[in-house]
Amino acid sequence: MARQKIRIRLKAFDHRVLDQSSQKIVDTARRTGAVVSGPIPLPTEKNIFTILRSPHVNKDSREQFEMRTHKRLIDILEPTPKTVDALMRLDLPAGVDIEIKL
C-alpha cells in the first residue's frame, strides 16, 4: 500500500505570523500521532515596483517599493483521520495563505 502524504504550503508577507502558523500546524499534527517533516523555509519571493516621484517631469527621480512573500513547506507523513480532522478545525491568522495537497 502506498504511503499517504499531506503537503502544506504556507505563504505570508510577515514571517513572524508565518512561523507561528507553521508551529501550530506541526504541534497539532504531532499531537494526533502523525510524522511531520518541516517546516522547511522556501526562497522568499521579492516583487519590486518602481514609480516616478513626480507626475510630470524628472524621469531620473524614481522611488522603489518592494513586497516580500515568505513561504514554508510542511509534509505530514502517514496522517490519520484524527490528524485531518484536527487540521480542518485549526484556526490560523488571516494573513496566511494555505495550500494543501493530498
UniProtKB/Swiss-Prot annotation:
The keyword rRNA-binding does not apply. It holds the Pfam family Ribosomal_S10. GO terms for biological process: translation. One of its GO terms (cellular component) is ribosome. GO terms for molecular function: structural constituent of ribosome; tRNA binding. InterPro entries: Ribosomal_uS10, Ribosomal_uS10_CS, Ribosomal_uS10_dom, Ribosomal_uS10_dom_sf. It comes from the Bacteria. Keywords: Ribonucleoprotein, Ribosomal protein. PROSITE patterns: RIBOSOMAL_S10. Involved in the binding of tRNA to the ribosomes. Part of the 30S ribosomal subunit. NCBIfam families: PRK00596.1 (NF001861), rpsJ_bact (TIGR01049). Belongs to the universal ribosomal protein uS10 family. This is Small ribosomal subunit protein uS10. The gene is rpsJ.
